[in-house]
A protein has these predicted regions:
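The feature marks the mature, well-folded catalytic cores of soluble enzymes
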Residues: 1-239
């Protein structure tokens, strides 16, 4: 049997935001008996199960909370959802990734300045749902630049991205919007809200894919980071 060589990517493992969120929750779980997270704290079932063994349960709606402590997941939430939680007078532990929080602030600032906001991202992803809330009325999330031109475009248009998207695909998207929207838009502002640590992992996956015969991406199926790594490598090598 031929010898099989296994090589790991030079960048791998949980990103800083996820590691931070897990550490915060683990510390809180050791100090308190009842903690609930609004959705899974991270998109990794092994971590969710381990935290459940420590007494941390996940709920999908604020109405399911019976008291105690609520933790906001690393993906962040909308201001509307935050208000619902605060109205229940619960103690809140916020594990929102700092990079995601920066994207939320960018969306809020654009909205306050009168820009219509477009988010390059998956509309059903928890992070993007939160960003849409910070981006104000009329904000949209899409991965298709063609959709933008079909809208009733505002005179001032701002674009940000879901933090885990591909840099190259975000650049392609913004170029498409520039070409299609400029005849109608007076001012266009693009803010790079992508996570640099995520980009390093994508670059490492690409680097490994071009010299491999088979690529195995280890992660959870509903993780945006895992999906992006598979998308990067699959056009080059069986993944």
């Amino acid at each position: 049997m031929a010898k099989v060589e296994v090589e790991k990517a030079r960048e791998l493992g949980f990103c800083l935001g996820v590691r931070r969120a897990i550490k915060i929750i683990e510390t809180a779980a050791r100090e308190h008996q009842e903690i609930a997270t609004l959705g899974p704290i991270v998109h990794n079932q092994m971590v969710v199960t381990r935290l459940a063994d420590m007494g941390v349960r996940a709920v999908t709606e604020p109405d399911q909370l019976r008291g105690g402590i609520i933790a906001i997941a690393s993906h962040g939430i909308s201001p509307e959802l935050l208000s619902q939680i605060q109205a229940r007078q619960l103690r809140v532990i916020d594990t929102t990734c700092p990079i995601v929080r920066s994207a939320q602030k960018a969306a809020q600032k654009l909205s306050e300045l009168g820009f219509g906001v477009v988010i390059y991202g998956e509309a059903t992803h928890p992070e993007v749902k939160g960003l849409l809330g910070w981006a104000g009325t009329g904000a949209i999330a899409t991965l298709d630049g063609k959709e933008i031109a079909a809208l009733g475009l505002p005179r001032r248009l701002g674009i940000i991205s879901q933090t885990t998207q591909s840099h190259s695909q975000f650049a392609e998207f913004t170029n498409k919007v520039i070409n299609d929207a400029f005849p109608y838009v007076r001012e266009l502002r693009i803010i790079n809200t992508l996570c640099q640590e995520t980009q390093k992992r994508q670059e490492a996956a690409l680097e490994l894919a071009v010299k491999s015969e088979l690529m195995i991406v280890v992660g959870w199926h509903n993780s945006a980071n895992t999906l992006r790594l598979a998308q990067v490598s699959s056009p080059i090598v069986e993944s």
